[in-house]
Amino acid sequence: MKRFEYEVEKLRTEFVLNFNDSLTRAEEFVAEISQVASDINAKYGTIEVDAKSLIGFLNMSHLPLQIIINPINDEDLKRFNEICKKYEVKSYVK
């Protein structure tokens, strides 16, 4: 008897996102990510800001940003992954 094999995608705590093509997309991202209770930061090099802060986020939105969550529960982590996948940079070269 063959067992069913399911491939479960592992939830990530970091994504690289880029909003240099649209301030509107950056604003939409901040609005969506603000619905998540966990702390979420945007980082470029040594500069790090609260990803839920529109002003802080827009200051760096023209750069490829590393978005990092410190999840307080599985639901926040799942929602974070759903949001970030919509904006994810598919290939990034430093």
In which residue ranges do the predicted regions lie?
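N-terminal amphipathic/basic-hydrophobic helices that include classical n-h-c signal peptides
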Residues: M1-E7
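Short glycine-/aliphatic-rich beta-strand segments at the starts of folded cytosolic domains
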Residues: V8-F19
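Short glycine-rich, basic-tinged beta-strand/loop micro-motifs
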Residues: L11, L63-I67
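Short beta-strand-to-loop capping motifs
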Residues: L17-D21, I69-N73
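Amphipathic alpha-helical interaction surfaces in cytosolic regulatory modules
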Residues: S22-S34, I47-L63, D76-K85
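Short, ordered loop/turn segments at secondary-structure junctions
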Residues: G45-T46, I72
